C-alpha cells in the first residue's frame, strides 16, 4: 500500500501536461459576414395567387413556357415549370388575355392585354405588346382601346403577320371591336373584321396547313353592373381564305339559325377539313321571348361547307362566358380537349366526353391550353389554381401555383371613409 501511494504524485505529474491550458484552446467561431450570405437566395413559399388566363409554349422546347395572369402579368419558365419569373411588371397593365410565340422565331412573343373570360372581377387591358427577346422585355404595339384581346395568331413563316381577336371592353357599344391584322410586326394595324359596335371577337384560329385559311368567332356581349347580356344577331362564325384580309359569314348548312351567344373554335392540325365550333345557345330556353337553339358542339368535316350538331353535353361549353376553350390533338382529328370548370376529353370526334376526376385533371376552372404541334404529349393548361404541365398527354400533371396578386373587393371604413 505504501508503494502505491508513493507513485500517485508521479502519475499526476505525467498526466497534467495532457490537459491543455484554456489559453491554448481553439478560438470561438467568428460571426458570419456578408460573404457567407451571398450564395443564399430567397425562395417564395406563399401565399399563392390568382388565376391564369393564357398559356403558350415554344415548339420543340420542353423547358420554356409562358403564362398570362388575370391581373398579374406575364410569367416565364426555362426549366420546365419548376421556377417562374414575372417579366411584365414594368408595364402599366397586368391583365393578360392572350399569349402567342412565333413558330418561325422563338424570340418573338406577343401578349394581348385585357382578360376575355367574363365575370364580375375582371380587368380591361391597354393594347397589345410584343417582345423580341423571348419575353424578357416588352413594347406596346398599339390597339390600346380594344379593351380585351381573347386570342393572337401568328403566321407560321412570317412573324410580322399577326392577327388579334379583340372583344372590346364589353361595357357598351364601341367601334374598336373585331379582328385586327398587321403585316409589319405591329407598326400598323387594320380592322379587317367588324360586325358592329355591340359585337367583338371571342376566338380566332388559323389552319395549320394553310395560313390563308382562318376562322373567327364573334360574340355580341354587354356587361352590366347586375350581370351580362350575351347573344344577339351579331354573334356568328366567319371564315377567311385570303389570310384574314376579307371575311365571309357562315350561315345555315347545319349551323344554328336562331340568335346565340359566344362562339369558340378548334381546328384539327392533321386534317384541315375538320373544324369544331362551340356555340352558346339557350339550351332551348326562350331568350327575350324568342325560342333558342339547343346544343353545345357542332362539327364540319369539309372545311365549313356543312355542319352537324355533335354534342349537347354542358361539359363542352358550360358557363360559356367564363370558359369556352378547346384544342385538338395535332396527330388525331378525333382527339379533342374541352375546358370548362371540368376538364374533358373526347377520342371520337366530340360525340362523347370523358370528364377527368378532379384529382386527375390539371386543376379547376380551366381557361387556356397549348399543345406542342410536334409532340402532343406535351401540354400546358392555365386555370384558376395556377398552371399545369404534362409530358404524358394528360395522364400525369405537374401543378404549380405562383404568387401573382389579384384584387377581388375594395371597401372603405364607414367612420373614416
Give residue spans per PLM region.
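N-terminal secretory signal peptides that target proteins for export/translocation
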Residues: 1-5
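Beta-propeller blade termini and top-face loops
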Residues: 25-417
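Bacterial N-terminal signal peptides
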Residues: 8-21
Amino acid at each position: 500500500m505504501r508503494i502505491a501511494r508513493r507513485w500517485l504524485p508521479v502519475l499526476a505529474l505525467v498526466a497534467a501536461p495532457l490537459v491543455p491550458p484554456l489559453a491554448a484552446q481553439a478560438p470561438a467561431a467568428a460571426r458570419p459576414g456578408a460573404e457567407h450570405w451571398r450564395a443564399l437566395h430567397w425562395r417564395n413559399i406563399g401565399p399563392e395567387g390568382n388565376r391564369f388566363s393564357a398559356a403558350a409554349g415554344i415548339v420543340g422546347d420542353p423547358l420554356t413556357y409562358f403564362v398570362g395572369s388575370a391581373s398579374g402579368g406575364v410569367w416565364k419558365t426555362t426549366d420546365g415549370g419548376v421556377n417562374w419569373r414575372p417579366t411584365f411588371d414594368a408595364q402599366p397593365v397586368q391583365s393578360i388575355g392572350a399569349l402567342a410565340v412565333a413558330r418561325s422565331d422563338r424570340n418573338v412573343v406577343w401578349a394581348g392585354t385585357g382578360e376575355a373570360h367574363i365575370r364580375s372581377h375582371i380587368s380591361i387591358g391597354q393594347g397589345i405588346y410584343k417582345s423580341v427577346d423571348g419575353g424578357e422585355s416588352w413594347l406596346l404595339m398599339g390597339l390600346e382601346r380594344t379593351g380585351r384581346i381573347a386570342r393572337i395568331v401568328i403566321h407560321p413563316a412570317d412573324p410580322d403577320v399577326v392577327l388579334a381577336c379583340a372583344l372590346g371592353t364589353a361595357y357598351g357599344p364601341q367601334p374598336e371591336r373585331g379582328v385586327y391584322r398587321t403585316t409589319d410586326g405591329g407598326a400598323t394595324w387594320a380592322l379587317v373584321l367588324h360586325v358592329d359596335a355591340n359585337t367583338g371577337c371571342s376566338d380566332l384560329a388559323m389552319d395549320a396547313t394553310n395560313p390563308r385559311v382562318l376562322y373567327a368567332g364573334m360574340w355580341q356581349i354587354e356587361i352590366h353592373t347586375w350581370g351580362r347580356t350575351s347573344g344577339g344577331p351579331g354573334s356568328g362564325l366567319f371564315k377567311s381564305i385570303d389570310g384574314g384580309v376579307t371575311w365571309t359569314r357562315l350561315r345555315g348548312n347545319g349551323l344554328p339559325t336562331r340568335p346565340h351567344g359566344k362562339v369558340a373554335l378548334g381546328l384539327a392540325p392533321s386534317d384541315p377539313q375538320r373544324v369544331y365550333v362551340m356555340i352558346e345557345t339557350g339550351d332551348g330556353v326562350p331568350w327575350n321571348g324568342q325560342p333558342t337553339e339547343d346544343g353545345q358542339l357542332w362539327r364540319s368535316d369539309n372545311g365549313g361547307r356543312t355542319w352537324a350538331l355533335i354534342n349537347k353535353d354542358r361539359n363542352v361549353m358550360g358557363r360559356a362566358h367564363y370558359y369556352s376553350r378547346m384544342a385538338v390533338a395535332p396527330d388525331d382529328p378525333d382527339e379533342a380537349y374541352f375546358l370548362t370548370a371540368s376538364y374533358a376529353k373526347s377520342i371520337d370526334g366530340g360525340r362523347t366526353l370523358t370528364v377527368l376526376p378532379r384529382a386527375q385533371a390539371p386543376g379547376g376552372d380551366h381557361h387556356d391550353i397549348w399543345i406542342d404541334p410536334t409532340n402532343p404529349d406535351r401540354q400546358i393548361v392555365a386555370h384558376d389554381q395556377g398552371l399545369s404541365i404534362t409530358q404524358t398527354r394528360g395522364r400525369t400533371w405537374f401543378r404549380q401555383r405562383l404568387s401573382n396578386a389579384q384584387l377581388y373587393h375594395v371597401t372603405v371604413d364607414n367612420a373614416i371613409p
